[in-house]
Amino acid sequence: LRLERFVKTILCYGDSLTWGYNPVGADRHAYEDRWPSVLQAGLGNAALVIAEGLNGRTTIFNDHAAGADRNGARILPTILMTHAPLDLAVIMLGSNDMKPWIAGHAQASKQGMQRLVDVIRGHDYPLDDEPPDILLVAPPALCETADPDFAAMFGPGIAQSRMLASIYADLADEIGCGFFDAGSVAKASPVDGVHLDAANTRAIRRGM
């Protein structure tokens, strides 16, 4: 790929599902298996795909148990300024909001996604650039797992996570964003109940 020939720039803003956390082995998926990388391969020089995934990132909530800033709204302006100009921002967040000490409710994630859209649309971009188009993506629902640590963190939020797709779809209609349900093509691995194996990670791009 020749960078000078890219036509569009796409920001993929997310958590460990975008970073590429591999539930099998608790390591990181190979570059070519992460869904932003698969998207890049499919688009070729038509677009530059920027993967901004951080393990544990929430929509708008603080996680004081984390070693880095997981609040997606607080860090977003810096990321927008770093990568401007942007043509499309793809936001897939909400899974970590389901932790009981974070929010634990799908409606909270809706408010969080609304705030992220407001940040993107209201940001003071350099060189008078226009805000990018926005695609809201609902992450695959959480599922049951025998892993005791992940079950304690995410088990209470399974039912709420199943509501994210319909809630995000309604929000996208209300505020004029695109919408995609990643759960329509990918399922969380029962190994930890949250993350995606390589095949399901790649499937997000194909569905999108």
Label each region the model flagged.
Residues 4-6, 45, 69-207:
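Alpha-helical cap/lid subdomain in secreted, periplasmic
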Residues 2-54, 60, 65, 78-82, ...:
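Serine-esterase "nucleophile elbow" of acetyl-processing enzymes
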Residues 56-58, 188-189:
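Short secondary-structure capping/turn micro-motifs that flank functional sites
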